[in-house]
Amino acid sequence: MDSFQQLQLRMKDCQKCLDEGFDIVPGAIFSGPQSARAMIIGQAPGVTEVEAKRPFNAGSGKRLFDWLNRAGWEESDFRQNQYMTSVTKCYPGKDRSGKGDRVPSKQEQLICRPYLQQEFRIVDAVLIMPVGKLAIAQFFREFKRLSDLIGQAAYIPWEHRSHELPIVVKKSELTDAFTRKESLGGSWVVPLPHPSGASLWPNKPENKMLIDRAINIIGDIRSAYDL
């Protein structure tokens, strides 16, 4: 059994958050092969993801795959050939109101971080798309507003994969255009807002323009690397 398979088994069997008293539904949700060249990192699975046993299964998945389709990917192709995971791996349960899903605590994020770190190192993705603030913070911790990040990309050299998450990307490292860096080796990180229907951010005209720019960058990277 190789290291990737061992990692998957450890994630599926993990009950560390449950042991710490968090009312999660154990059973990590992720998908995709080790050979994936693109990776999506979400916040955490929702209840429909648990039922379907696949990431981004509900309405948020529809919007996300609408964006990816505009960048050149069919949903079935992406799900089969690319990698999808999240900051925390298990469904965190409902929030106090009972209407929405609970945002994973900082402690839960720390518990799960070694898994994400290993995924980041093992899956040799040339394109990483953190989706939503929790995932974006794994790379862009110094940025507080989505409008300062969406529509931008950052190139992370390969040696940064040995660094502990979060990786701190500086403002000077951001670009709003893709230029292939074949000789360097590494990953392009293109953040996306959370595609949940409950989020109003993607619906604002000025933000739609930023999303369009992000989709164009993703499409350029997909084409350049034949993803």
Where in this protein do the model-derived segments appear?
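A polyanion-binding, active-site-adjacent surface
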Residues: 1-227
